[in-house]
Structures are given as C-alpha cells and as structure tokens.
UniProtKB/Swiss-Prot annotation:
InterPro entries (alphabetical): PCRF, Pep_chain_release_fac_I, Pep_chain_release_fac_I_sf, Prokaryotic/Mito_RF, RF-1
Record organism: Burkholderia thailandensis (strain ATCC 700388 / DSM 13276 / CCUG 48851 / CIP 106301 / E264)
Modified residues (N5-methylglutamine): 235
UniProt lineage: Bacteria, Pseudomonadati, Pseudomonadota, Betaproteobacteria, Burkholderiales
Gene: prfA
UniProt family annotation: Belongs to the prokaryotic/mitochondrial release factor family.
Domain of life: Bacteria
Keyword Acetylation: no
Recorded GO MF terms: translation release factor activity, codon specific
PANTHER family xref list: LD18447P
Location in or out of the cell: Cytoplasm
Chain's role: Peptide chain release factor 1 directs the termination of translation in response to the peptide chain termination codons UAG and UAA.
Protein name: Peptide chain release factor 1
Entries under PROSITE patterns matching the protein: RF_PROK_I (PS00745)
C-alpha cells in the first residue's frame, strides 16, 4: 500500500474517533441539521476505517508468520499463514483504493428521469413508454418512490415526452449512466410485412436540487404561462387554466406540468424540474472542459451519444460504451438492471483509478 494512501486512511481513522465523540454529545444531537450531517459523514467513512482495520490485522498476521519462518518445525504452517495474510492484504488494499475514489456529490440524491421520443414516430413513443416501465419496475425493486411530474402521451400509446421523479437513497448513483440515446430494433405492432424498424429515444437523468434555492433562479428571468390541461388527442380534462408552462429566459429551458388539477401544485412541480434542468446544464458545462482533455467513456451523459441498442428479434441488449451484450432483454425490460448497472459502475471506477494513476 502506498504511503500517501495509508496516511489518508490514518486520517480517516482519527476522524471516525472524533465523530464518535461528537455524536455522543447532547448539544450536537440537539442540533438536527448538524447531527444529520455528522451521521452522514460517519456512515461514509465507517466502512472504510473498518476495512483498514482488517488490512492492518492482515499485516500484523504477515509479520507474525515471518517470525515463525525461522522455526523449522513451524515452516509449513508459517508459509501457509504468510500466503493467506498477503492475499488478504492485496484484496483489502484494492477494495480500499476503490472506496477512496472521489465521490460524486450528487450520488445519494433523488432524480428526475426525462424520456423523449426521437426518430421513429409512433414506434419511438411506444418505446419511450417501454423505457419508462423499465425504470419504474427497477425503482419498485429498490423500494423507491415514484411521482409523475409531466407527461405528453402519444395517440397510439406511449409518450412523446415524460418526466418522473424517483426518490430513494442512491437513486442518482444507480441510474446516472442511463443518460443518452437508446435505440430499439423490433417489428412494430402496426407493421404488416414483418419488417424490423429502428427507432430511438433520449433519456436524461438529473439529480434533484436539495432545495430550489440551491439553484439561483431570478424570478425576473421566468415567464410563467397558464393554459388548459389536455390529454392524448387534445381532449380537455378540465375547464380551468390549471396547466403551467415555465420558461427560463436566459437558458431557454421550458418546463410544462399539467398532471394535477391544482395550478399551484403544477407550478411547484415545474419549478422543481426547472431547477434540476438548470443544475444539470451547469454540471455538464463544468465537466465539458474535463471531457475535452480526458475522454470519459461512461460518465459523459451526452444526450446525443447513442449508448445502447435493444434488439428484440435477437433478445439482446448491447451497451456500446463498454461493449457489453446481454441476452436477457425480456428481464431487462422488466426492470432487471442490476447486472448492467454493476458493469457500468465497475468500468467507471476503473476509469477513475486510471485517471488518478495518470495524475500521480
């Protein structure tokens, strides 16, 4: 283990002891905000310090085994102990290196998932509905909460555009790699000749701002229009102007919400989505310079980048960023995303490790 890494782990061990002391004080537990902040930090570094304690124990076992090597009668036993200790040290050091990787500050946040139909007309809108169901089924498996924020249904089913809010611990860390272009190859229900069509949708996964105030929005920069909510085919749902359209003039970002009968609730939802979109735009602009110097295969989140193909006749899903093909399309479309997400997270961690190595 590198000296710099060991020094960092020693600092975290000291910090954990400080946190244990602070969290036992009444004045700290009385301040809810401070208590929440400290418990979050404790939860983050606790597993790292525990791993480091195991590594130090393995190193102590290694030293003890080396001393036993001098005794001829204990040599076979000592060699087995030495080999086992070194294997544990190597495994724990690799795991610690991954645990010390820079954390994305948005990882534990709730998210907004925005799905837009692209090329392919009605078939693209139907596939947008299939993607929404896939994410909702995954959220259900994680016991996350889902709230419909905005929807624009298509005439034949599916969606021209749909936005949902998914609330759950670590939602962004699990689904952030879904941003990009999703292509589908299948025979549409309306196809009489049995020909395979190709269509596409774009997905944007945006972390929710903790508070709308976290993103600076000048009320003077907003244009808010109200109109009558309508469903698929244009039929009016109610007689009042309950639907809300919010335009952020400096960026040109437009958000519409009409799912609730209350204009106030629709406006509140629209402002939340707007804050997330502005935050997302700032995040990608900030990382554009880094992307220019170091091509990030996984985490770019570029909406125009085709990241995945779903081939229904062959029952396969291919993620083009990591050249991963899985022949379990039915399960994937039913929300079984764990294998795919684990592969993407692993590749992203490998990229981070490589970039840290280059920096050193």
């Amino acid at each position: 283990m590198k000296t710099s890494m060991q020094s960092k782990l020693d600092q975290l061990t000291t910090r954990l002891a400080e946190l244990n002391d602070l969290l036992s004080r009444e004045n700290v537990t009385a301040d809810l905000d401070q208590y929440r902040k400290l418990t979050r930090e404790h939860a983050e570094i606790g597993p790292v310090v525990e791993h480091y304690a195991q590594w130090r124990q393995a190193r102590a076992d290694e030293l003890a085994a080396q001393e036993l090597l001098a005794d001829a009668s204990m040599r076979d036993f000592a060699e087995d102990e030495l080999r086992g200790a070194r294997e544990r040290m190597s495994r724990l050091a690799a795991e610690l290196q991954t645990m010390l990787l820079p954390k994305d500050p948005n990882d534990e946040r709730n998210i907004f998932v925005e799905i837009r139909a692209g090329t392919g007309g009605d078939e693209s809108a139907l596939f947008a509905g299939d993607l929404l169901r896939m994410y909702l089924r995954y959220a259900e498996r994680q016991r996350w909460q889902v709230e419909m924020m905005s929807e624009s249904p298509s005439d034949l089913g599916g969606y021209k555009e749909v936005i949902v809010r998914i609330a759950g611990y670590g939602a962004y860390s699990r689904l952030k790699f879904e941003s990009g272009g999703h292509r589908v190859q299948r025979v549409p229900a309306t196809e009489t000749q049995g020909r395979i069509h190709t269509s596409a949708c774009t997905v944007a996964v945006m972390p929710e701002a903790d508070e709308i105030g976290e993103v600076e929005i000048n009320p003077a920069d907003l244009r808010i229009d109200t109109f009558r909510a309508s469903g698929a085919g244009g039929q009016h749902i109610n007689k009042t102007d309950s639907a809300v359209r919010v335009t952020h003039i400096p960026t040109g970002i437009v958000v519409e919400c009409q799912d609730d009968r209350s204009q106030h609730k629709n406006k509140d939802r629209a402002l939340k989505v707007l804050a997330a979109r502005i935050k997302d735009k700032q995040y990608h602009e900030q990382h554009a310079k880094e992307a220019a110097t170091r091509k990030s295969l996984i985490g770019s989140g570029d909406r125009s980048e085709r990241i995945r193909t779903y081939n229904f006749p062959q029952g396969r899903m291919t993620d083009h960023r990591i050249n991963l093909t899985l022949y379990k399309l039915e399960q994937i479309m039913d929300g079984d995303l764990d294998e795919l997400i684990a592969a993407l997270v692993s590749e992203h961690q490998a990229e981070l490790l490589a970039s840290l190595g280059d920096a050193e």
